[in-house]
Every structure is written in structure tokens, then in C-alpha cells.
Amino acid sequence: MVATGGQAQDQSQNQEPDVLNPTSAVTGLPQKRYYRQRAHSNPIADHSFDYPARPEDVDWRSMYPSIQQGQQVSFADVGCGYGGFLVTLGEMFPEKLSIGMEIRVKVSDYVVDRIAALRRRSADTGAYQNIACLRTNAMKYLPNYFSKGQLEKMFFLYPDPHFKRAKHKWRIINQALLSEYAYVLRKGGLVYTMTDVEDLHKWIVTHMEEHPLYERLTEEEANADPITPKLYQSSEEGAKVVRNKGDHFLAIFRRL
């Protein structure tokens, strides 16, 4: 039977969602090409965000369905990108809650969809219930989500270098923000930084060493941390640097 024009159009419309389906039929995971966005976002711009007035108002159960009474987020991956390192954290620390914070809407949507797909694929084991992602501006709203001394670890992996001097104030590491990070970090908590830009690395080290509430881990201490090897290529940006045979600059700091 030959389809009429109307029937052919209906069939085409019915097939279109399959063609545009952002989920891979092979892996069951979302495909990045449907979530592409510019590499960086202006953190000073007046983006429209919903954010809690205080940490007590955060509905963590909506992000972590299996959260236990009194359990809190322990790790924050600030600027988590496409979530590669966040997934690694979930696998390495199944008893800890990790949050990814990402300012770009399409990228954060991808991470949310990725986590949902991983949870469906691991329904029999209950894996990946301990990771979540939220779209927010960590440079403005971090204290709205975390209480004093709550976090054990914070990660700043391959942040935007903002090369122009006039934009250095946009860098995620600066003196004012370091005090906010110290507020939400517990004593002894760790800040992990990694970049492939040497100038930014020197900037980070200088500012953190000048701040009275941080001290840099020795090379021996950093190498003994089981997280350190994962910092190089667990994230998508890190893996790209490895593929391009680029340099990595690592610095880890302890909250005093």
C-alpha cells in the first residue's frame, strides 16, 4: 500500500522524536552533541537562578532520593562541566554525597540527564544515588547551599582562566571568594585545583598561600591522596589535555 502525502507526513512526524532522541540507543546515556554550549559563561552577569535563602531550605531529597536523615553533602565539584569527575567521585566514595555545580544551563542539563540514566542502568545495585548536579553560580550563592564547616572537599578542575587582566576578577579563585570557601569547609578540609594554564596555576597558588586559612599540601601528601590520580583525566577537560599531551598543574590546599 502506498502512503498518501498526509500519511507520509504523519509517519515522518512520528519518527522525528527517535531521530532527535538525545539518548544513545547503545549506552543509554545522553549524547553531548545535543547539549553543546559555549565553553565559558560570564559569572558576573545577572543570570536568572532559583536559589535558597539559606542551607536549611535546600530540598536535598529531590536530588538524592536515598539520602538518610541528617546526611549532608560532603564534596562539591565547582564548575563540574559534563560531570566526568563527579561520576568518579560517586564511584570512589559510595557513602558520601557529592554535588556538581555548573553555571551553564545546557551543560548542567546534560549532567542531570546523565546521572538519571546511570541510575536507571544501575537500578539493581542502587549506584549513583549519591551524586547530583544543580545549575547555580557558585561565585554568588555558595553559602546559600552549605552551612559553616559542612564540606570535606572542594574541587576546582580546569576553571576558566579569564586571560585578560580586566577579567581576572571573574576568576573562581580570588581573595574574597577564598574566605567564602573557608567558611563552608571544615577544618582540615581540602581544596583541589587543577589547570593546564601555568599562569592561572601561579595565580591560584599565590592567592591561596597568601590567605591565612589555607596551607598547601606537600608533594608527598598530594601524591598519597587516592583522589590525585583521578584528577588528571576523569573529567572531560582533563582527558582532552591528556590527549593533546598538554601540561597539568596541580595544587591541593588544607583548610586551617
UniProtKB/Swiss-Prot annotation:
Gene Ontology cellular component?
A: nucleus; tRNA (m7G46) methyltransferase complex
* MF annotations from Gene Ontology: tRNA (guanine(46)-N7)-methyltransferase activity; tRNA binding
Q: What is its EC number?
A: 2.1.1.33
Task: Give the metabolic or biological pathway.
Answer: tRNA modification; N(7)-methylguanine-tRNA biosynthesis
Q: Does the keyword Cell membrane apply?
A: no
One family from Pfam that matches here is Methyltransf_4
So what does this thing catalyse? guanosine(46) in tRNA + S-adenosyl-L-methionine = N(7)-methylguanosine(46) in tRNA + S-adenosyl-L-homocysteine
Cystine pairings recorded for this chain: none
Q: Where in the cell is it found?
A: Nucleus
Positions that bind S-adenosyl-L-methionine: 79, 102-103, 137-138, 157, 235-237
Where this protein primarily resides, as one coarse class? nucleus
What domain of life does the native source organism fall in? Answer: Eukaryota
Disordered: annotated span: 1-25
Q: Keywords in alphabetical order, please.
A: Methyltransferase, Nucleus, RNA-binding, S-adenosyl-L-methionine, Transferase, tRNA processing, tRNA-binding
Record function comment: Catalyzes the formation of N(7)-methylguanine at position 46 (m7G46) in tRNA.
**Per its UniProt record, what HAMAP family does this chain match?**
tRNA_methyltr_TrmB_euk
Tell me which family the UniProt entry assigns to this protein: Belongs to the class I-like SAM-binding methyltransferase superfamily. TrmB family.
Q: What is this protein called?
A: tRNA (guanine-N(7)-)-methyltransferase
**Provenance organism:** Drosophila simulans (Fruit fly)
